[in-house]
Swiss-Prot record:
Pathway: Nucleotide-sugar biosynthesis; ADP-L-glycero-beta-D-manno-heptose biosynthesis; ADP-L-glycero-beta-D-manno-heptose from D-glycero-beta-D-manno-heptose 7-phosphate: step 1/4; Nucleotide-sugar biosynthesis; ADP-L-glycero-beta-D-manno-heptose biosynthesis; ADP-L-glycero-beta-D-manno-heptose from D-glycero-beta-D-manno-heptose 7-phosphate: step 3/4. GO terms for molecular function: ATP binding; heptose 7-phosphate kinase activity; heptose-1-phosphate adenylyltransferase activity; phosphotransferase activity, alcohol group as acceptor. It comes from Salmonella arizonae (strain ATCC BAA-731 / CDC346-86 / RSK2980). This is Bifunctional protein HldE. In the N-terminal section; belongs to the carbohydrate kinase PfkB family. ATP binds at residues 195-198. Coiled coil: none annotated. It catalyses: D-glycero-beta-D-manno-heptose 7-phosphate + ATP = D-glycero-beta-D-manno-heptose 1,7-bisphosphate + ADP + H(+); D-glycero-beta-D-manno-heptose 1-phosphate + ATP + H(+) = ADP-D-glycero-beta-D-manno-heptose + diphosphate. Residues 1-318 are annotated as: Ribokinase. Catalyzes the ADP transfer from ATP to D-glycero-beta-D-manno-heptose 1-phosphate, yielding ADP-D-glycero-beta-D-manno-heptose. The active site is at 264. Keywords: ATP-binding, Carbohydrate metabolism, Kinase, Multifunctional enzyme, Nucleotide-binding, Nucleotidyltransferase, Transferase. Residues 344-477 are annotated as: Cytidylyltransferase.
Length: 477
């Protein structure tokens, strides 16, 4: 099915709010500290990602939309790191620097897919003059289709009513991800996007769908909102609008690893889609699909147009089944951040038989994820002769992708997958047959990266060549 994504390249969005830097330290935990009963993490990977309002801007820019970010920062390394990273993603930063305050920074230490501790470095910006923020909003109103106010209660949005009034006077939609229980400060917004706990903290505990709808409609009337979108985790999301039936959308997430930043993704996709000229219902549809993508990643993350298109077509955004090489690299990177061991093998897999299935199941048991690289049709002909393959590449990959033991399937055009393996660098490279490890394509690259290479036995009596010969013999009778 062809999916028509919104014309994101025509969308202009301004994001105003609490800007943060998210830092991540990853590493294995092998012992307990002699100083205190706490684990010792040997840090081997350090990452810095924009968080808060900056993550909203990243999500918008990653879709190909024009994102302009306004917020309060210090004059420090964290602010410079934010500006550098955001510029690489084509986010236009227009920060207001506050010399007396540090840039808000959150440091997370993770090991084996578990967050061990979070350290926050911040001082509230509540006393800072908001007028420079108002000036920046005024300057941008003629070139944007949506204004996002990203509220983390850190002080950047002390004058929300002024910001809403400026945008509404220019007929620009105002989308707000709320914080706290004082929804009065968001009066007149186009759309609020509270999660279920935030919604119930204001409206009260809801025992049924009807009660949620009833209380949501009261909030819309009480605070003069155009719409309310309640995000409900595994229950999806619910859109409420005056004089319209509620729109319930089930979740599209297939695996949930981390909900960090999921709300930023939702409001970012909503804003970009509305600014591109789509309806609110369409915006919610794409935002729901994007949320299913981002919770399958670790930490604050963004969604690309390819991932979004795959998600609305029903393909798992975390990457399962048939993939392009670039999609595979992204999926492997996410798996590594989750501490998963990646196993890789390759072959023609022309006529899938019991020996193949047994071999792949055994390979999968050696790690957490299994990649199968498949020779293209041209590569197979060079390797096996003009009569092969019997089954074309697309069919071979679909069948492999349907196996429970196989996570990712990718093709390669060369005679060997050496280039592909060098780009993926699995933790374990396996091959079936009577090879010596050093004879296996890609073994040198895997060893050089600290990985392992292993030879597994094929099941006796199973051979694609023998199956083909038997079919030919039977057909000649």
């Amino acid at each position: 099915m062809k999916v028509n994504l919104p014309a994101f390249e025509r969308a202009g969005v301004m994001i105003v709010g609490d800007v943060m830097l998210d830092r991540y330290w990853y590493g294995p935990t092998c012992r307990i500290s002699p100083e205190a009963p706490v684990p010792v993490v040997k840090v081997n990977t350090v990452e810095e990602r924009p968080g808060g309002a900056a993550n909203v801007a990243m999500n918008i820019a990653s879709l190909g939309a024009n994102a302009r970010l306004v917020g309060l920062t210090g004059i420090d390394d964290a602010a410079r790191a934010l500006s550098k990273t955001l510029a690489e993603f084509n986010v236009k930063c227009d920060f207001v620097s506050v010399p007396t305050h540090p840039t808000i920074t959150k440091l997370r230490v993770l090991s084996r897919n578990q967050q061990l501790i979070r350290l926050d470095f911040e001082e509230g910006f509540e006393g800072v003059d908001p007028e420079p923020l108002h000036e920046r909003i005024n300057q941008a109103l003629g070139s944007i289709g949506a204004l996002v106010l990203s509220d983390y209660a850190k002080g950047a949005l002390t004058s929300v009513q002024t910001m809403i009034a400026l945008a509404r006077q220019a007929d620009v939609a105002v989308l707000i991800d709320p914080k706290g229980t004082d929804f009065e400060r968001y009066r007149g917004a186009t759309l609020l996007t509270p999660n279920l706990s935030e919604f119930e903290a204001v409206a009260g505990k809801c025992k049924s769908e009807d009660e949620l709808v009833e209380r949501g409609m009261k909030l819309i009337a009480n605070y003069d909102l155009s719409a309310l979108l309640v995000t409900r985790s595994e229950q999806g999301m619910t859109l409420l609008q005056p004089n319209k039936a509620p729109l319930h959308m089930p979740t599209q997430a297939q695996e949930v690893y981390d909900v960090t930043g999921a709300g930023d993704t939702v409001i970012g996709v909503l804003a970009a889609t509305l600014a591109a000229g789509n309806t609110l219902e369409e915006a919610c549809y794409f935002a729901n699909a994007a949320a299913g993508v981002v919770v399958g990643k670790l930490g604050t993350s963004t969604v690309s147009p390819v991932e979004l298109e795959n998600a609305v077509r029903g393909r798992a955004a975390t990457g399962f089944g048939v993939m392009t090489e670039e999609e595979l690299k992204q999926a492997v990177a996410s798996a590594r951040k989750r501490g998963e061991k990646v196993v890789m093998t390759n072959g023609v897999f022309d006529i899938l038989h019991a020996g193949h299935v047994s071999y792949l199941a055994n390979a999968r048991k050696l790690g957490d994820r299994l990649i199968v690289a498949v020779n293209s049709d041209a590569s197979t002909k060079r390797l096996k002769g003009e009569s092969r393959p019997v089954n074309p590449l697309e069919q071979r990959m679909i069948v492999l992708g349907a196996l429970e033991s196989v996570d990712w399937v990718v093709s390669f055009e060369e005679d060997t997958p050496q280039r592909l393996i060098a780009g993926i660098l699995p933790d374990l490279l396996v091959k079936g047959g009577d090879y010596k490890p050093e004879e296996i394509a890609g073994s040198e690259e895997v060893w050089a990266n600290g990985g392992e290479v292993m030879v597994l036995n094929f099941e006796d009596g199973c051979s694609t060549t023998n199956i083909i010969k038997k079919i030919q013999t039977e057909s000649e009778k």
